[in-house]
Amino acid sequence: GSEMCIRDSSMAELAELANACEMEVVGSCVQHTQINKAIYVGPGKLGQIREEAEELQADLLLFNDSLTPSQLRNIQDDTGMAVMDRTTLILEIFASRAKSREAMLQVEVARLQSLLPRLVGLHDALSRQGGTSGSMSSRGSGEKKLELDRRRAQSRLTELRRELAEMETERRTQQKKRARSAIPRVALVGYTNAGKSTIMNSMVMRYLGDAEKTVMEKDMLFATLDTTVRSITPKENKTVLLSDTVGFIDKLPHGLVTV
């Protein structure tokens, strides 16, 4: 029924995301039961995945969901393979595509927000294993390093958010100036890779006739993360500002919504 269609669509989208990250998909499988808190899928299914991955000579296991730090670690330990979840994959794509300073900072914030819970989870696991009280002097070297990494990540997040807040203030000022100019703004919105850039380019060529002002078109999810604005005049004395935007996608990491 509809649930199966949604699942198939989501898996097809994951394959496209993998291709966008220059990965070759060699196999896939679906589990219908509830999520296993320890290893995401059931023990039998994970064993099947491990065997099929070995037969297919796969280098990476890619999960169509966000994994918890413990799930990620347990799956890696059980299979002996590199493991990536959907959130990390999308973050990798955004990191490789971001061009503007603001987009790069936003991607870094999202990556750090994704990393911090993993550092905290590993830190807690080490604390339980060692039975430490929490003071730096009583901790092992691995636990101390995790604590330092966590503090550095928190400090960097604070710094990035401060810089992004300054950029947001500047952008709001520019938006107010544009609002006073009374020029209408039109944004092309829709799913990623749905053809927004194609529409943008057809309008640019029709009303501007300048190929240098077209945007990149590529049959790939998130081919570009930069919003492009062009001033066009579809009717005499009726100028509009046309924007090509980053597209929508399912399960987008919350920290990337503003990119």
Task: Describe the function of each predicted region.
Residues 133-143, 147-254, 258:
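Conserved G1/Walker A P-loop phosphate-binding module
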Residues 9-12, 35-51, 224-227, 246-259:
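Switch II of P-loop NTPase G domains
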Residues 19-37:
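Short beta-strand elements in bilobed, periplasmic/extracellular small-molecule ligand-binding domains
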Residues 27, 60, 81, 239-240:
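Hydrophobic "anchor" residues on beta-strands that sit immediately upstream
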Residues 1-6:
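Short, small-residue-biased leader/transition segments that mark boundaries at the very start
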Residues 8-16, 26:
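Terminal alpha-helical anchor/extension segments at protein ends
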Residues 97-160:
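Long, charge-rich intrinsically disordered scaffolds of nucleic-acid metabolism proteins
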Residues 47-121:
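Accessory, often N-terminal, substrate/partner-engagement and coupling regions
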